[in-house]
Amino acid sequence: MAEGPSLHPKLQVDSNIPIEISSQIPQEPARNLAFQMRQSPLVTPGSTTKSSLSVPERNLLKQESEGPSRQSGCMPLSDKYVNKQTSPMASRKFRKERTVYTKEEQGLLQKHFDECSTQTRRKLWSWHYQLVLQRGRLRYGSRTTELSTGR
């Protein structure tokens, strides 16, 4: 039998361990994700399964079923973080409403935008030019030329 590319010794997998297929994992709500990750889903046919939850994990599951307690220090999620809709459309984000402007409003906004952007460009150019004058030279690619001030 031909072997595939060799892995680093720490990354090699024992060939006797069955490979987990994602379709074998039941799809449950996200709150049980920690349980899914720690549960041993590798089961051979005919063998019985035993939950491999540690004591802190059992306590966590017990607290979830009983509700929040003062000892746990956990705060329940507020309604704004809990998505109560269960349909697939619940997670879809909708576009914000567009603001419709009249021709006059559009003209005013465009004029304001043009003035602001022109002023910004002028300020940037002025700042850049002042910097060039202070340094006394201009840079073109890899060559530097001295700025003649005409004095």
From Swiss-Prot:
Specifically expressed in oocytes and early embryos. Disruption phenotype: Female mice lacking maternally transcribed Obox1, Obox2, Obox5, Obox7 as well as zygotically expressed Obox3 and Obox4 are infertile: embryos arrest at two-four cell stage due to impaired zygotic genome activation (ZGA). Residues 37-54 have a biased composition (Polar residues). It comes from the Eukaryota. Residues 1-97 are annotated as: Disordered. Belongs to the paired homeobox family. Obox subfamily. In contrast to other Obox family proteins, displays a truncated homeobox domain and does not bind DNA. This is Inactive oocyte-specific homeobox protein 2. It comes from Mus musculus. The gene is Obox2.
